[in-house]
Amino acid sequence: RRKEIAMVKIEGLYNTAFCYTPVLEDAARAQIQSVCDQKEFAGCKIRVMPDVHAGKGCTIGTTMTIRDKIVPGMVGVDIGCGMETVELSEREIDFERLDALIRKEIPYGREVRDEIHALNAELDLSQLCCADQVNLNRAMRSIGSLGGGNHFIEVDRAEDGRLFLVVHSGSRHLGTEVANFYQDEGRRALWGGAHYQIKATIDQMKAEGRFKEIQKTITALKREHDLSIPKDLAYVEGALFDDYIHDMKLTQKFAILNRKAMVDVILSGMGLTPVDEFTTIHNYIDTDAMILRKGSVSARKGEKLLIPINMRDGSLICIGKGNEEWNCSAPHGAGRLMSRHAAFQALSMEEFQKEMEGIYTTCVVPDTLDESPMAYKSMDEIIDQIEPTVEIVQRIRPVYNFKASD
């Protein structure tokens, strides 16, 4: 008998969202409520994953079906972010040598490569509809670079001794440029010069002394231009929708190649042999099923996926069940227990060092305290919630971790 899963239901003016979590923070609830209150998203199936927490512009853990409108800000700036998981034939690795190789050959933080990686040949970024808004040279030199924040390179060991290389990274600054361009275009297309027109009208009415009429006029003008939708939820439709989908898919491919380039540098530099490899993506639109996933991953029937928990507990290798009620999706991690700012305030380096004992890492430093295991929800909390959408095949535990500070 399937056990009951804790769930929070959020009813809005035009839609109802289901969040697969026992507890929902107020900020995340407000963001989800805002989406459910927009008539433009009526009829979209909104399902929010157990690792839910408030994000910039949209709740992390959001999945929703889409039709002819998309909010670029909901996919976010790190388009195509995800994990490349590689099973290795080796059972032992020289971690000191690996760490030195990564620090020498893989740019991290805001750094990019001096030379472009050979995998650039598989992508033509000049085909982006917004190519003139993008620093193409920097983008090309970013393929094979890690970035900062929660991005990491890790070696994990399964219970049977097998080793897995996991690389978590995204589309670097290119994703930010593409996302910001389309979000701005969406705002312009929706509102045009409406804000300017309203301001000019108010100034004129004040000059004419018609103060009592101002509020009524503003309301009428706002209705005329439909300014009710929040700034963060400005959407694109029509030709802009098509252009965004085109550029998002290219940027998604860029992110995949970025991870594969880092894998290539590590495998060739260390002389390691891959046995199996799979990709798990968590900020994108699945254009086959027309499902938006923000901080959530695809879990189609039979699909292999990785759910990383934290840098102490490792990851879950899972097989999707294809649960339509969950939008064939799963969480992309454990989800944050506290914001980055709160983590820096509340957590200690002593505790961080103690929690990471037994794992080879040179990255347990004050700058990465916000990424410490204590800043995330527990593995048990996630395992309890995901039974309807995935089968856990195995848990892999970190033996090496590299995480850049920003």
Per-segment meaning from a language model:
Residues 63-64:
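Glycine-rich phosphate/pyrophosphate-binding loop regions near the starts of catalytic domains
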Residues 8-34, 41-48, 54-60, 69-72, ...:
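Domain-length cofactor-binding catalytic modules of enzymes
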Residues 1-6:
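Short, Lys/Arg-enriched N-terminal segments with co-localized hydrophobic residues
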Residues 72-127:
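A generic, well-ordered mixed alpha/beta core segment in the N-terminal half of proteins
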Residues 52-53, 81:
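Acidic, glycine-rich active-site loops and adjacent beta-strand->loop/helix elements
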